[in-house]
């Protein structure tokens, strides 16, 4: 089956397509895609992943045509608004 792996690195957005075996997990597909060689800053222990915009675990099984998304880490949220709503 075929799946794609996308990583929205601001410096070099990447989308890779790869052929994987039926029943392949998200993590296996990420490994097989080569994205970790292209983007060594990816840390699957710290970054969330999803399939078509929904968070999934690394051991989740895939279906033909799935798009795996590796999300950027949020390093800081700056709350600089002046309202008293929060």
Curated annotation (Swiss-Prot):
Superkingdom field: Bacteria
Annotated signal peptide: none
Family classification: Belongs to the UPF0125 (RnfH) family.
Protein name according to UniProt: Protein RnfH
């Amino acid at each position: 089956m075929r799946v794609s792996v996308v990583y929205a690195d601001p410096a070099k957005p990447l989308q890779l397509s790869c052929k994987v075996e039926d029943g392949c997990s998200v993590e296996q597909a990420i490994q097989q895609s080569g994205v970790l060689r292209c983007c060594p800053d990816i840390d699957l222990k710290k970054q969330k992943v999803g399939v078509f915009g929904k968070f999934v675990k690394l051991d989740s099984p895939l279906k033909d045509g799935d798009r795996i998304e590796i999300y950027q880490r949020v390093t800081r949220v700056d709350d600089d608004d002046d309202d008293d709503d929060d």
